[in-house]
Amino acid sequence: MQIMLCAISNIASGNCSEDCKYCTQSAHVKTDIQKYRRKELSQIVLEAKMAKKNEALGFCLVTAGLGLDDEKLEYVCEAAKAVQKEVPNLLLIACNGMASVEQLKELKKAGIFSYNHNLESSKEFFPQICTTHTWESRFQTNLNAKEAGLMLCCGGIYGMGESEEDRLSFRKSLQELQPFSTPINFFIANENLKLQVPRLSADEALKIVRDTKEALPQSVVMVAGGREVVLRERQYEIFQAGAGAIVIGDYLTTKGEEPSQDIIKLKEMGFTFASECH
């Protein structure tokens, strides 16, 4: 079986105006995460080279904040061009919040292949985890990305206190969008966050992967944040459950598995790594 590996770079961290209860980058909570307006282009390129060395096909440029403005758009485009020049065989993904069709077309011109904007949860549950913007605005940005001609990466976070009905509604919304890839994140509570709920069990997490693949058979199911903590020694069972991709290395504000450990284990299990997108 061939799987896709992706890595992410948090190129603008923290001080986000939004009040998402699950996020340590929100300015509404006090956390000890690193905060910076922009990462040096040389550092982004270095991380991209490391991602490629670690068999990654996708590399995501992530910025904190509600969405793109002119300054941030220019910066993301600069970063994309810098990575493309030095590491030409990576598929670039951008994750920069709300964006218009015109802004997204500019990202595509700069070399961005796919846009990631998660719905996070169901339309019904979303007001319980965020009040500073609407679920509908997130859905519209995904429509904008498709109109701009970008591949779509859209998923969310599970284990925030949502019901089974919420998960079903969420999957139905994803079916409307039919994303190329759909990330699954498992919520891990942080003492500084307003959201404090019991952690998902490994069985629940694997069921979520199975249900997502069943709902979206044509999408690449990517297991991302929380994989190592929630699934522990069972984390590689995700592929039997329908996953076709994982995020390797560190996440936005938390540590991930050492990429070399993932690669060794996956090779032992007989997996190969995608070098192009079909």
Swiss-Prot record:
Keywords: 2Fe-2S, 4Fe-4S, Biotin biosynthesis, Iron, Iron-sulfur, Metal-binding, S-adenosyl-L-methionine, Transferase
Molecular-function GO term, any one: 2 iron, 2 sulfur cluster binding
Gene3D superfamilies, sorted: Aldolase class I
InterPro entries per record: Aldolase_TIM, BATS_dom, Biotin_synth/BioAB, Biotin_synthase, Elp3/MiaA/NifB-like_rSAM, rSAM
Enzyme Commission numbers on file: 2.8.1.6
A Pfam family of this chain: BATS
Cofactor entry: [4Fe-4S] cluster; [2Fe-2S] cluster
Alphabetical list of NCBIfam families matching this protein: bioB, PRK08508.1
Family per record: Belongs to the radical SAM superfamily. Biotin synthase family.
PANTHER family: BIOTIN SYNTHASE (PTHR22976), BIOTIN SYNTHASE, MITOCHONDRIAL (PTHR22976:SF2)
Protein name as annotated: Biotin synthase
Organism encoding this protein: Campylobacter jejuni subsp. jejuni serotype O:2 (strain ATCC 700819 / NCTC 11168)
